[in-house]
């Protein structure tokens, strides 16, 4: 079954902190709460390093919820034809699900269906079949814990499995699990889609998670993303799910993620100013 979603506004942890040490976790959670967000999206690239008890205490202290995202690596790529690598990917995804469950979260999103990064060629039938099978296993595992999985559609330089929302929906048809949803990100859509509405309208209630990011990943409204069309489409389908503000700058670096995403430029310095203005921007439109 699919698990309940609500319209809620969150911020990606990397807006405030590049690590999840005790100090980093407090900085991120306090920052998200200070800006007025409902939840924080925690990057579970290495879920074994998360201090669950500490994080739960901080979430309670700041009255914040948590969801989680991650991207796989070459060592954990579930599209691989090497069963040992697929097994490592399964293990990582299960551990991330366990951590999210312990934190009381209900949405696991991101590039959880392949390695996050540029592939040397298109996916083979076997690569795709392996990915579909892995998502079926993950969805079933997550369902036992009341968790939805949201598969993020990203640009051609970060996956060869799905680059548009329509491709994502076709992939979800193969996964065929009620708790598996589409995750759209305006930054990636701006690169790959023919307009910002088509995939949203096609997805309808299968759209389960949204990332709001500008074309350069900085301040919202200062790039070339057509947010008016995107939010109009969300209204047309009456979207009721998480909306996360996501932004990256060399000001705050996570070595496991920033280099993979090619975050070379310093697009902002003040996390609080960035996050506060982003939430205002989003709520004015949705």
UniProtKB/Swiss-Prot annotation:
Documented effect of changing residue 286 to L: Affects thermal stability. Slight increase of the activity with D-allulose as substrate
Keywords: Carbohydrate metabolism, Isomerase, Manganese, Metal-binding
Co-factor requirement: Mn(2+)
Temperature characteristics of this protein: Optimum temperature is 70 degrees Celsius with D-allulose as substrate.
Annotated D-fructose binding sites: 12, 69, 152, 158, 188, 211, 217, 246
Superkingdom classification of source: Bacteria
Residues bound to Mn(2+): 152, 185, 211, 246
Active-site annotation: 152 (proton donor/acceptor), 246 (proton donor/acceptor)
Residues the entry annotates as binding D-allulose: 12, 69, 152, 158, 188, 211, 217, 246
Entry keyword Iron: no
A Pfam family: AP_endonuc_2
GO molecular function, one term: metal ion binding
Subunit structure: Homodimer.
Family of the protein in this entry: Belongs to the hyi family.
Function: Catalyzes the epimerization of various ketoses at the C(3) position. Exhibits the highest enzymatic activity toward L-ribulose, followed by D-ribulose, D-allulose and D-fructose. Shows lower activity with L-xylulose, L-tagatose, D-xylulose, D-tagatose, L-sorbose, D-sorbose, and weak activity with L-allulose and L-fructose.
Protein name per Swiss-Prot or TrEMBL: L-ribulose 3-epimerase
Lineage: Bacteria, Pseudomonadati, Pseudomonadota, Gammaproteobacteria, Methylococcales
């Amino acid at each position: 079954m699919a698990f309940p979603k609500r319209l809620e506004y969150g911020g990606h942890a990397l807006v405030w902190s590049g690590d999840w040490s005790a100090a980093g976790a407090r900085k991120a959670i306090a920052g998200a709460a200070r800006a007025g967000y409902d939840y924080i999206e925690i990057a579970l690239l290495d879920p074994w390093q998360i201090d669950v008890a500490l994080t739960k205490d901080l979430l309670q202290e700041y009255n914040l919820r948590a969801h989680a995202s991650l991207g796989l690596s070459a060592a954990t790529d579930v599209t691989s034809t090497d069963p040992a690598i697929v097994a490592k990917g399964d293990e990582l995804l299960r551990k991330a699900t366990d951590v999210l469950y312990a934190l009381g979260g209900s949405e696991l999103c991101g590039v959880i269906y392949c390695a996050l990064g540029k592939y040397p060629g298109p996916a083979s039938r076997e690569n795709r079949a392996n990915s579909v099978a892995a998502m079926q296993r993950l969805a079933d595992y997550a369902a036992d814990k009341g968790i939805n999985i949201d598969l993020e559609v990203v640009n051609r330089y970060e996956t060869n499995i799905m680059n548009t929302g329509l491709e994502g929906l076709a992939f979800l048809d193969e996964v065929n699990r009620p708790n598996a949803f589409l995750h759209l990100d305006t930054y990636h859509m701006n690169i790959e889609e023919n307009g910002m509405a088509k995939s949203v309208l096609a997805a309808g209630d299968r759209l389960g998670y949204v990332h709001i990011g500008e074309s350069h990943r900085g301040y919202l409204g200062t790039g070339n993303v057509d947010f008016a069309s995107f939010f109009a489409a969300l209204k047309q389908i009456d979207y009721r799910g998480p909306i996360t503000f996501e932004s990256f700058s060399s000001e705050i670096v996570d070595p496991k993620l920033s280099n993979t995403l090619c975050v070379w430029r310093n697009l902002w310095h003040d996390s609080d100013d960035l996050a506060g203005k982003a939430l205002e921007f989003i709520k004015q439109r949705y």
